């Protein structure tokens, strides 16, 4: 691959558009775009197979993740030059209200952006997930002569991404899985926001990644287009290992303060722009693209991508004729439509932990939904997430549907985001609920990106018992419930668990977190008939008062049974209360005023909420006149039933609390 003066001009155009957008906004990060523009240009205009005309609709396109999302001006410049729906006016409106060019890339907001990025390191894990999805779908759908799924995943990152723990978890997993179609481009400039990386980051990146099972390739000069192209070709030629291409760059190349942290995160000023353009030998007016550069992109990424997709569409038509059932399944998998399943009801009189009823649901879902796969962060035996009839997803069996994420909660959740962003599958992942704290940054990104992933969180309360307070969730429910666009469902029995899974699979634009018990839960009267509608509405009357309504007991999960027993005890004393099962506060909050009034009449102020977690957040449901039977301290090490008793989760105490209202 050879390059000429027009290619160099194209690199200068990318650099200039980026720093001009940042200057117009008087906000942004010029250092990365100025330093990394050459590698980004080579990748985009000479290597990647994407079709700007169809954008993310072509399923076999290459994927690109800007893990160092603060360098978004670089990406927007590339998108504009490549023919995506990012205009010059959009570049001029960088970081402004309502613009297509926000401070960090946002998927489904800006045409051509594959992943929302910014929190450092997560983009690497997203890319690992995308590569996992590509490998899985290729093993599933490809046939001799028909490589329907055959593309690469690229991510551009900096030193900061490698300092984050999530990138190390993800890199370890990718090396184990031998994801040969994953290529990282490492903007290695030895500078972080605070100063030289020598202050805090002195490890041997090459040795570390080789120990992970990666190929490491070094490009000594980040402005050497030929060397960069050769390195990418070498990375693509290695099929049994992921590759990291370390490109030694100068942060803020061309600026007076190049090579220092001063150019990392602030505009360089108009004088600085003029100086940089002088270094580049580039005199095009601000926010313009030389005709030669425009033609080079027309002949590069635009022509190559359109030709590649046209060839793929022709091949897929032949594939569809030869393998109609597989082709139909492929189309359904990428449609991102609500998934509907039938699950066996749980009969009154039986009792299983909701993690076990979830396991039973997972087995049934896997039989009905071929795109369904997932796993656990080394807790499959406890989370009950493995599909017994399916094989494992490993380097020698990418068709497997059981994913072993290892003890890597954060990377698991971030990789799940990448899997969902890639499309073609419905993914789930599990761990203990107390460890949800380890993965919350990735859950937040899933909610922000409207990704329909499912989290299987088990061991949901102090009923964990003997393991003690380190493993007993207290504040977690309040924490995850506070997150926008996240379904949180804590089912009371097997039928509510079935309904929770059905709701999760019906979602197409938000993640769902299932919060499940370790201990057995009896099947409750009426849930076989009412749980599905009740869960979908977030709360429902599971047992009505037997006489004139005195008050309401609201409960979730394992405490619904306690609420029902308390209701019976109060009835025996002539006190008539309603019991409301509230598996999902957020779904209840979305109901209309009439339904909320039906379940929780405003005139009924005597309310008691029962939940084995913090009281935080319950005030909006019980009101100032109500009370809670909750836990606002840490758990303890003892059998779970003893802990419940010590913390007052008994019929006697609940009855007294209600009567004190």
Positions of predicted regions on the chain:
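Terminal amphipathic helices with adjacent charged low-complexity linkers/tails
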Residues: 59-60, 243-338, 586
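A short, small-residue-rich loop immediately preceding and capping a beta-strand
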Residues: 25, 62-63, 113-116, 146-164, ...
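Cofactor-binding active-site loop characterized by glycine-rich and histidine/acidic residues
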Residues: 36-177, 386-387, 419, 527
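Non-catalytic terminal/interface segments that mediate subunit docking, oligomerization
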Residues: 310, 314-452, 530-541, 547-548, ...
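N-terminal capping segment at the start of a domain
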Residues: 11-27, 187-189
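Thiamine diphosphate
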Residues: 96-108, 132, 136-150, 167-288, ...
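Buried hydrophobic positions in well-ordered alpha/beta secondary-structure cores of metabolic enzymes
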Residues: 18, 29, 39, 75, ...
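A short glycine/serine-rich beta->alpha loop
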Residues: 4, 21-30, 59-67, 109-121, ...
């Amino acid at each position: 691959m050879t390059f000429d003066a027009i290619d160099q001009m194209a690199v200068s155009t990318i650099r200039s558009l980026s720093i001009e957008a940042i200057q117009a906004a008087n906000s942004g990060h010029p250092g990365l775009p100025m330093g990394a523009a050459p590698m980004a240009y080579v990748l985009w205009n000479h290597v990647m197979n994407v079709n700007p005309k169809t954008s993310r609709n072509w399923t076999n396109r290459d994927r690109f993740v800007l893990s160092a999302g603060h360098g978004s001006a670089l990406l927007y410049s590339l998108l504009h030059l490549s023919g995506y729906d990012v205009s010059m006016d959009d570049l001029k409106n960088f970081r402004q209200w309502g613009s297509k060019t926000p401070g960090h890339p946002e998927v489904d907001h800006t045409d051509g952006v594959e992943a929302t990025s910014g929190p450092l390191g997560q983009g690497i894990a997203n890319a690992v997930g995308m590569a996992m999805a590509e490998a899985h779908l290729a093993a599933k759908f490809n046939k001799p002569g028909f490589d329907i799924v055959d593309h690469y995943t690229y991510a551009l990152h900096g030193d900061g991404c490698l300092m984050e723990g999530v990138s190390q978890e993800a890199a370890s997993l990718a090396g184990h899985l031998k994801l040969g179609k994953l290529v990282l481009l490492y903007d290695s400039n030895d500078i972080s926001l605070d100063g030289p990386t020598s202050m805090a980051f002195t490890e041997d990146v090459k040795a570390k990644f080789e120990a992970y099972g990666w190929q490491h390739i070094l490009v000594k000069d980040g402005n050497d287009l030929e060397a960069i192209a050769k390195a990418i070709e070498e990375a693509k030629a290695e099929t049994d290992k992921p590759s990291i291409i370390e490109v030694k760059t100068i942060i803020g190349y061309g600026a007076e303060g190049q090579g220092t942290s001063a150019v990392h995160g602030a505009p360089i000023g108009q004088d600085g722009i003029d100086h940089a353009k002088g270094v580049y030998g580039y005199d095009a007016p601000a926010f313009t693209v030389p005709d030669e550069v425009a033609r080079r992109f027309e002949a590069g990424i635009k022509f190559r991508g359109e030709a590649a997709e046209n060839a793929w569409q022709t091949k897929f038509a032949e594939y569809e004729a030869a393998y109609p059932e597989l082709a139909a399944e492929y189309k359904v998998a990428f449609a991102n439509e609500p998934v509907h399943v039938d699950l066996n009801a749980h009969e009154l009189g039986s009792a299983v932990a909701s993690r076990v009823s979830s396991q039973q649901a997972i087995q049934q879902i896997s039989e009905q939904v071929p795109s369904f796969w997932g796993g656990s962060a080394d807790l499959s035996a406890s989370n009950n997430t493995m599909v017994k009839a399916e094989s494992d997803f490993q380097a020698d069996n990418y068709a497997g549907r059981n994913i072993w994420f290892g003890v890597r909660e954060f990377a698991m959740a971030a990789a799940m985001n990448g899997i969902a962003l890639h499309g073609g599958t419905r993914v789930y992942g599990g761990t203990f609920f107390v460890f949800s704290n380890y993965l919350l940054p990735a859950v937040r990104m899933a909610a922000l990106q409207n990704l329909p992933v499912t989290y299987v969180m088990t061991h949901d309360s102090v009923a964990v018992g003997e393991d003690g307070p380190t493993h007993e969730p207290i504040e977690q429910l309040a924490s995850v419930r506070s997150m926008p666009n996240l379904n949180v469902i804590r089912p009371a029995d097997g039928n509510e668990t079935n309904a929770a899974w059905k709701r999760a699979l019906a979602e197409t634009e938000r993640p769902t977190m299932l919060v499940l018990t370790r201990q057995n839960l009896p099947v409750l009267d009426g849930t076989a008939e009412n749980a599905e509608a009740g869960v979908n509405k977030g709360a429902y009357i599971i047992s009505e008062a037997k006489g004139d309504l005195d008050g309401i007991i609201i409960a979730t999960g394992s405490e619904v049974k306690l609420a029902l027993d308390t209701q019976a005890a109060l009835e025996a004393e002539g006190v008539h209360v309603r019991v409301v099962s509230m598996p999902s506060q957020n779904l209840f909050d979305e109901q209309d005023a009439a339904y909320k009034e039906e379940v929780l009449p405003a005139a009924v102020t005597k309310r008691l909420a029962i939940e084995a977690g913090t009281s935080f957040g319950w005030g909006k449901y019980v009101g100032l006149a109500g009370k809670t039977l909750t836990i606002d301290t840490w758990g303890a090490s003892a059998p779970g039933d003893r802990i419940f008793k010590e913390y007052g989760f008994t019929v006697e105490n609940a009855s007294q609390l209600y009567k004190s209202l």
